Amino acid sequence: MTAPATTTSVAPVAADDRPTVLSVRNLDISVRSDAGIQPLVQNLSFDLKRGETLAIAGESGSGKSLTSLAIMGLLPPPAVHVAGGEILFDGQDLTRLPEHKMQHLRGDRIAMIFQEPMTALNPVMRIGDQLTEAIRAHEPMSARAARARALEALQAVRLTEPERRLKQYPHELSGGMRQRVVIAIAIALRPDVMIADEPTTALDVTVQRDVLDLLRELATEMGMALILITHDMGVVAEMADRVLVMQSGRQVEEASVLDLFGAPQQPYTQHLLASVPRMGQGRERGVDTKARPLVSVRDLRVTYDLRGGILDRVQARVHAVEKINFDIYAGETFAVVGESGCGKSTVARALTGLVPHEGVIQFEGKPLLRDRASQLANTRAMQMVFQDPMAALNGRMTVGDLVREPLVIHGIGTAQSRTDRATELFERVGLGPEVLDRYPHEFSGGQRQRICIARALALSPKLIIADESVSALDVSVQATVLDLLEELKAEFGMSYLFISHDMAVVENIADRVAVMYLGQIVEIGSSAQVFGNPQHAYTRRLIAAAPYPDPRRVIPARARSNSELKSPVMPVGQSPEIVSYRSLGDGHLVAV
């Protein structure tokens, strides 16, 4: 079931005569540490008008989330504190209000939506109880009246079957539905100001689109002022009236969204906008698909049994990947895209032997075997770069040891030659030999990902599997890492299996693309074919949902999906229907 489609003009210009509801004046935030008091945010000032959407944009460590926590009075005491300035709301300086008065304002007059909905909800309370608890904490009313208000809030956020949702627990809802519940709690008391701190970062792109549409509509309907904290300039372009750009705790630039994107004044803003990958900027790339594939996958199938009951019997089965076929050719970047649960990361794990699978995987014409000797040989030919570099690096080892470790495991070279190789690789990824004796925690996120890439290159692999390898990085760092991957491919002649949910990144880096949905490939072809002439409805939906960093763009009319995503879990004995394909020529296949 879908709601009526609407055509929305993006980022309307704010009226100057609207009253100001919140003023921040010369705000300073500091932290106490062993080294003394360190400034985190310095001399920040801005006004927020009624009904306006102000985006506070910047990269990690810019101070944007600290600013939102300061407004809410939620800075972690005693280390982090407001060191100076004012936060004026309704004639009161929030920095000087006692906690009991701030508790009354929080949720009632100023509400906040956090990035991760699961951590914002109590996992052992039903949704209805959490809503009514928040409502009755601020407005004395009967349980029946509070329940009616809770139901009204769930209806306002367009949640299907709101009566049933009241009785459910958070874990029974999808990520997008949980975020809608968090928004429902925030609007239940009809606040004057809503702060949304990266409200869609943890969500899939189509769910993100629905949540952004919802926030825009609710702000208009309820006359709320909205502060949107984000690092995504595409989201800024589509949502904001005005933009405040922060870097390292300082205000860099503030302007209307049209002025900021049309004529950014500061070098940092210009660099930030130039780093954003844009749809429609991919280039035609030639791949010799008549040559023998480097990797050939046929009828790949991965399932997981779900056990339960007193006898711990298999009760259902997750069909993570179901009978997919694809080839990867020498020197190409083959991208697999899709949303959470589509099976794309499972494909990577199957190729590297990390999960049991059915079907045939061939590397250079030979089947990949699962015995230890074969798997050791496979790791020389195939390496992975994971999403979270900090989790992928042993914090107790120096980065030099981490890069030398694959050479030690495979018995390659002498101690000196391994050090020489590590030095060479560090220089190639933009880090000098002086870093060899440092530890992972001493580096930034982008530098740690470069270390992971250096380690992956140590064995001179023919295929690197990059599983969401840039999704956790700031946009400017992401751009430099993507450029590095392109340079390394050209220099060493490697192939990439690039796994991502970011359609703009994929269009800019991939030679060919496979779109996955519920464990199956629904469209496959060259980047130009898939992005320039998408045929499957799901592919078109993914492309349409991607935020675009241009506030002049008008969001096309689109029906909002209120249905829940289908599940890959099926009863034992049942399997999903295997798709068949229609060929559009030149290797462009679409599921029918």
Task: Give the location of each predicted region.
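Conserved ABC ATPase signature
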Residues: 168-173, 177, 439-443, 447
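ABC ATPase NBD coupling module
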Residues: 38, 80-81, 94-111, 129, ...
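A short, proline-enriched helix->beta-strand linker immediately N-terminal to the Walker B motif
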Residues: 188-192, 458-462, 478
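Short catalytic/signature loops enriched in Gly
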Residues: 14-20, 160-164, 257-317, 375, ...
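Conserved ABC ATPase "signature" region
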Residues: 92-93, 145-164, 417-434, 543
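Conserved ABC transporter NBD signature motif
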Residues: 82-93, 359-370
